[in-house]
């Protein structure tokens, strides 16, 4: 008997000698966007293997730093869905933008993979938005190098490594990129209620920047959604844990 994940269909990948769960939709591609101040390298470490396990090709756009950050991410979704529907998603800001895009393109979105949403509606005092604004101000006051050093002073080693690489990659546009993300409204709960495709939501039980209450609220608002959780301390040693939680939630939502 196959486990719950494989009830949606599976086949043997003879080249790799593994059982590959088949996606419950006709989509063949998943486009995953990074979070605020993050990059495609981290997204790949989270989602590449879990997506391959369900037969989806991962498209992981790199951020375009600066004021065009959001529009470039949305354009990447448009381009990927030009010929056929896609599964869209991302982490934090990336999840917000995927849901925003799906609201405007419901016929081109076969599902949503929503990891660590940070707020719904206006960002206002959401911890993730406050943190991004504070970081942007620090970059402008101290310069990127000193701001990065201050940001990583009291965080776990894995997060320090991720922040250093990603923030360095944004170059002189780091502060503008952080502010652009912090000021972007996410879909409201009422808007999320209009998304009828299967949606997998993932949250962390120990993440103060992306409170689990937000992921729970998104899950309750979405008509066809499931929530799976993990912990930051696990992601620190196994980034794929976040991807597995999100993909598993999507598979569960697809069966409902």
PLM feature segments, named:
Residues 195, 201-203:
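Short beta-strand/loop motif that positions the catalytic acidic residue
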Residues 2, 9, 13-67:
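Conserved HGGG/HGGXW glycine-rich cap/lid loop of the alpha/beta-hydrolase fold
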Residues 116-165, 174:
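Helix-rich cap/lid subdomain of alpha/beta-hydrolase
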Residues 225-256:
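Catalytic active-site module of serine/aspartate enzymes centered on a nucleophile-bearing elbow/loop
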Residues 52, 69-86:
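Conserved acidic catalytic loop of the alpha/beta-hydrolase fold
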Residues 90-98:
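Gly/Ala-rich beta-loop-alpha elbow adjacent to hydrolase catalytic centers
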Residues 161-190:
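Hydrophobic, aromatic-rich cap/lid helix
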Residues 208-214:
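Conserved alpha/beta-hydrolase "acid-adjacent" motif
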């Amino acid at each position: 008997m196959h486990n719950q994940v494989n009830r949606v269909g599976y086949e043997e990948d003879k080249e790799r000698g593994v059982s590959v769960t088949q996606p419950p939709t006709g989509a063949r591609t998943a486009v995953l966007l990074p979070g605020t101040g993050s990059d495609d390298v981290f997204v790949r470490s989270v989602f590449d293997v879990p997506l391959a396990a369900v037969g989806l090709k991962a498209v992981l756009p790199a951020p375009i730093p600066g004021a065009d950050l959001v529009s470039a991410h949305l354009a990447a979704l448009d381009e990927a869905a030009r010929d056929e529907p896609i599964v869209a998603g991302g982490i934090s800001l990336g999840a917000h933008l995927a849901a925003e895009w799906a609201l405007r393109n419901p016929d081109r979105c076969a599902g949503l993979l929503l990891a660590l949403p940070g707020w719904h509606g206006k960002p206002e005092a959401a911890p993730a938005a406050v943190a991004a604004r504070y970081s942007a101000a620090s970059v402008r006051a101290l310069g990127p190098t000193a701001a990065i050093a201050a940001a990583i002073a009291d965080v776990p080693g894995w997060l320090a490594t991720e922040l250093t690489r990603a923030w360095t990659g944004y170059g002189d546009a780091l502060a503008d990129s952080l502010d652009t993300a912090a000021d972007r409204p996410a879909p409201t709960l009422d808007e999320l209620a209009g998304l009828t495709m299967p949606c997998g939501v993932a949250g962390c039980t120990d993440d103060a920047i992306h409170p689990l209450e937000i992921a729970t609220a998104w899950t309750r608002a979405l008509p066809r959604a499931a929530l799976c959780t993990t912990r930051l301390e696990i992601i620190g040693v196994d980034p794929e844990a976040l991807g597995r939680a999100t993909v598993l939630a999507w598979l569960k939502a697809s069966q409902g």
